[in-house]
Design a protein with these regions (language model features):
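N-terminal ligand-binding/catalytic initiation module
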Residues: 1-119, 127, 137, 279, ...
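NAD(P)-binding Rossmann-fold cofactor-contacting core
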Residues: 160-184
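Glycine-rich Rossmann-fold phosphate-binding loop(s) that bind the pyrophosphate
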Residues: 146-147
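Adenosine-phosphate binding glycine-rich loop
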Residues: 13-18, 242-340
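Aromatic pocket-lining residues of Rossmann-like dinucleotide-binding sites
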Residues: 157
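Short helix-loop-beta connector
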Residues: 133-140, 163, 224-225
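N-terminal Rossmann-fold NAD(P) dinucleotide-binding loop
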Residues: 150-151
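Rossmann-like adenosine-cofactor binding region
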Residues: 187-271
Length: 341
């Protein structure tokens, strides 16, 4: 019988395998978007578990499954749970587990701590998008939402954009914002804390929203001419901000409009169609459509977040872990179990 061992990788194992290396993760994700453009993947709609007594947009469990083609050729699922009250209790907003299966026998080859992979791929995707969609001479970044995703995104941008001179951040929690500024300083990134989201975004060459707000509030006034607006959040930008964009770029059109996020709401009201957006990011990465063409154009980047990103990064981490002898082997399946039947 084929070996049925399953490799368990803790968060530290995932780190040791390279998951916090921005350049390495970025190279994996660039391949992913090329595969997306080539349709070399299978990814059904995400499965959402939401309870009526927990109406906040960030209170849910999502199951995202996918098969990613060569050179990864792996399939699996990310099971990610989120509660918007967690930070108030000193807990991470989101936690996740990723299960990888081999594509032939469908046996579980790995169980990975998935929150770090999920957060890193989210952050590095923004830096990758900035490479193609932001001005190369961008000097300022404005962030709303001083959480882990915001911190990792700023850190990733600092690695790839030495031209950035100013980072400004706002958060509704003054304590969280102060802790964020202090933490970023330990990473070598100086961030100025500001007193409003308008102050953070209005003059930013790259504007980032990474919050759990459930209603739109950021207007076109905070979308500077020549800037890139990264909608990492769920609902922050208003319709008028999105309408002000010269280009709208999404990671996956179908997923983007079959959700309860702001772009999907606009689509349901007939305000955004497939023909009215510039295109999908994979087409930009593959060179099939241009990214930024004009230093003055405003580009709205709307990443839904794709299962193929998680599975590809997890697959690369798994391969590195095997090569380095990391993790713990588990025997989930008893080869003799069928004697009972």
């Amino acid at each position: 019988m084929t070996d049925t061992g399953t490799l368990f990788l803790s968060q530290q194992d995932v780190i040791n395998a390279g998951a916090t290396d921005v350049d390495w993760v970025g190279a994996v994700l660039e391949q992913v978007f090329v595969l997306h453009e080539q349709q070399a993947f299978t990814a059904p709609p995400s499965s959402f578990l939401k309870r009526p007594e927990c109406p906040h947009v960030a209170d849910r469990i999502i199951g995202l499954s996918a098969h990613v083609g060569a050179p990864f050729d792996r399939e699996g699922m990310k099971w990610i749970a989120s509660s918007h009250i967690n930070p108030e209790h000193g807990l991470p907003r989101a936690n996740a587990v990723i299960i990888l299966n081999d594509p032939v026998h469908r046996l579980p080859i790995a169980i990975l701590e998935g929150a770090l992979i999920s957060a890193m791929r989210t952050a590095v995707v923004q830096a990758l998008a900035a490479r193609y969609l932001a001005r190369a001479d961008s000097e300022s970044v404005g962030l709303v939402g001083a959480g882990r995703i915001g911190a990792l995104t700023v850190w990733a941008l600092s690695k790839w954009f030495p031209s950035i001179q100013h980072y400004r951040a706002f958060d509704q929690s003054a304590d969280r914002l102060a802790a964020f500024v202090e933490h970023m300083a330990t990473l070598g990134v100086t961030v100025e804390a500001v007193s409003s989201f308008q102050e953070a975004l209005a003059e930013a060459d790259m504007g980032i929203v990474a919050t759990t707000e459930s209603e739109p509030y950021v207007t076109a006034s905070e979308f500077k001419r020549g800037s890139l607006f990264m909608n990492v959040s769920l609902m922050d930008p208003t319709f008028d901000l999105i309408n002000a964009a010269d280009k709208i770029v999404v990671d996956d059109w179908h997923q983007s409009v079959h959700s309860d996020r702001v772009l999907a709401r606009m689509h349901r009201e007939g305000l955004v169609t497939r023909d009215s957006i510039h295109g999908e990011f994979g087409a930009v990465v593959s060179g099939h459509i241009p990214g930024r063409e004009d230093p003055d154009e405003r580009i709205f980047w709307n990443p839904f977040g794709l299962a193929i990103e998680d599975i590809a990064v997890a697959s690369a981490v798994y391969d590195q872990a095997l090569a380095q002898g990391l993790g713990k082997s588990l025997q989930l399946v008893d080869q003799e179990w069928d004697v009972l039947f």
